[in-house]
Amino acid sequence: MKNILLMCSAGMSTSIMVKKMTEAAAEINAEVAIKAIPEQQLNDHLAGTDIILLGPQVRFLLDKVQSAAKDIPVRVIDTMDYGTMNGEKILRQALAILGES
């Protein structure tokens, strides 16, 4: 089971993305747990996280999150994929980074 953490300013738009990614995971039988958090809760959710995906609106936090995350991969979600809520593509990219594709 891979744990994917999505982060945005308030956790609202990423909660929709969690739903889309969870649906995509079910379709491809990927064993993942996906959750969305606001940026203020990052440190509370690092333990057990395999990858952190940042919403495009918080891309300016990339260096800060990478520093806090240490060895956890951190990526910014593509603006177009985020805007169109392409959960399948984002999930597949995360799994590829984790070597699960």
Predicted features along the sequence, with ranges:
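Conserved active-site segments centered on acidic
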Residues: 2-39
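Short, surface-exposed alpha-helical segments at coil->helix boundaries
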Residues: 15-18, 59-63
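Structural signal for conserved beta-strand scaffold positions within catalytic alpha/beta enzyme cores
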Residues: 36, 54, 76-78
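Short acidic active-site motifs
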Residues: 40-42, 61
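Short acidic/histidine-rich motifs immediately flanking catalytic phosphotransfer sites
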Residues: 46-51
